Amino acid sequence: MNATTSLAALAFAVLLAGQAAAQSETTTLPNGMDITPDYQEYGRWYNAEGIPTYKFDDEGAIDFATFNGYRRYSAECHVCHGPDGEGSTYAPALKESVLRMDYYDFQQVVASGKQEVNTAQNQVMPAFGTNKNVWCYIDDIYAYLLARGTDDLPRGRPAKKGPKSDEFREQEDSCMSM
């Protein structure tokens, strides 16, 4: 095999490896939470403590709920928090916030809003607890932000997604019809 063929084969192997994304080796966040997927319920993945997380399949597709979190984040959150959880000049990077904050604190802030006023800043986040497009998908949004925060999921629309399960669809219909 000549050098050109070897280089082409190496480049092809690297390309294939990049297409099949995988869970990162880091499973414990700075806040101490283990993000290893343990079980699935209503089409969503959770860790052993019942906290939403994400999972890639063997072909590198992200689970549907996390993909849905991308969609809901893009529709409801990115206006203030920037695309892909990266933050903006007036709102924090949520992909970093979820690595440090407790899931239940995240829920509380999303549901009730938050205001931080001091000499350096005046940050106000409105409450989204009554917005079904956010609250029915809070676990999905959280899982998406975790995947972004750990850099397991690159910027932009996820390239591959798992199927939407009947269980997910039923739970979604139930929540949206309340």
What are these regions (language model features)?
Residues S24-L29, S88-K95, G113-D140, L145-S165:
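Axial heme c-ligation environment in periplasmic c-type cytochrome domains
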Residues I62-P83, A111-S112:
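Sequence/structural segment immediately N-terminal to covalent heme-attachment motifs in c-type
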Residues Y70-H78, G87, R100-Q107, W135, ...:
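Sequence context surrounding c-type heme c attachment/ligation sites in exported
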Residues N2-T5, F12-F64, Y144-K160, K164-M178:
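Post-cleavage N-terminal segment of exported redox proteins
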Residues F56-D57, G82-G87:
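Short acidic/polar micro-motifs centered on Gly/Asp/Asn
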